[in-house]
Amino acid sequence: LTCVTSKSIFGITTEDCPDGQNLCFKRRHYVVPKIYDITRGCVATCPIPENYDSIHCCKTDKCNE
């Protein structure tokens, strides 16, 4: 599985997930109105959203773009 780890105006950076980590995730952490801190990567289980987080998990290559 290949997941996106970062995305910018220059393109995307990806990583091949290690054995046991079969999900890609994207976490949007609310900072201030219209501003989010976005984290992406591989996980074994989908994280539970905390505070003002929004989490998307998926199982296909680069699905967390």
Curated annotation (Swiss-Prot):
InterPro entries per record: Cytotoxin_Cobra, Snake_3FTx, Snake_toxin-like_sf, Snake_toxin_con_site, Toxin_cobra-type
Primary residence: secreted
Protein name (Swiss-Prot/TrEMBL): Adrenergic toxin rho-elapitoxin-Dp1a
GO cellular-component term (any): extracellular region
Cysteine-cysteine disulfides: 3-24, 17-42, 46-57, 58-63
Protein purpose: This toxin shows activities on different G-protein coupled receptors. It is highly potent on various alpha-adrenoceptors (ADRA) (subnanomolar affinity for ADRA1A). Order of potency is the following: ADRA1A > ADRA1B > ADRA1D > ADRA2C. It is also found to reversibly bind to muscarinic acetylcholine receptors (CHRM), but the affinity is much weaker (CHRM1 and CHRM2, Ki>1 uM; CHRM3, Ki=140 nM; CHRM4, Ki=120 nM; CHRM5, Ki=350 nM).
SUPFAM superfamilies: Snake toxin-like
UniProt GO MF annotations: toxin activity
Tissue specificity statement from the Swiss-Prot or TrEMBL entry: Expressed by the venom gland.
UniProt keyword terms in alphabetical order: Disulfide bond, G-protein coupled receptor impairing toxin, Neurotoxin, Postsynaptic neurotoxin, Secreted, Toxin
Keyword Protein biosynthesis applies: no
Family under the similarity heading: Belongs to the three-finger toxin family. Short-chain subfamily. Aminergic toxin sub-subfamily.
Subcellular localization, as worded in the UniProt entry: Secreted
Keyword rRNA-binding: no
Lineage: Eukaryota, Metazoa, Chordata, Craniata, Vertebrata
